[in-house]
Amino acid sequence: MYKRQGWYEWQRQENIKTPYFHFLPDNLLYFAGIYNLSSGCAVVTCESANNISHIHHRQPLLLDENQINEWISGKHEISRILDDQLSFYQVSKRVNSPKNNDKELLYKI
């Protein structure tokens, strides 16, 4: 499980990539994850929620606080109860460079 403020995703239209920040208003997000000692860790993804599918076809599998123990204990059929609450907005293309790492990357444009 990964606790995050949100995530970036890029909408592609021909040769143009537009970055968006996805988040849950007034809450942190918990991403479902997997871990293996020899190969490391990864965020589990799923098909995008209807309200963000026009930006990208996949998103992290989101857990609410009540689903965390279910995920950790091995229940892998998780209801996607947070999907309808997701919000997003366009952000600066500065997020495209790993050289940039400041709070302004989260600013709405």
Feature annotation, model-predicted:
Residues 3-109:
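A structured binding-face within diverse protein domains that lines the active/interaction site
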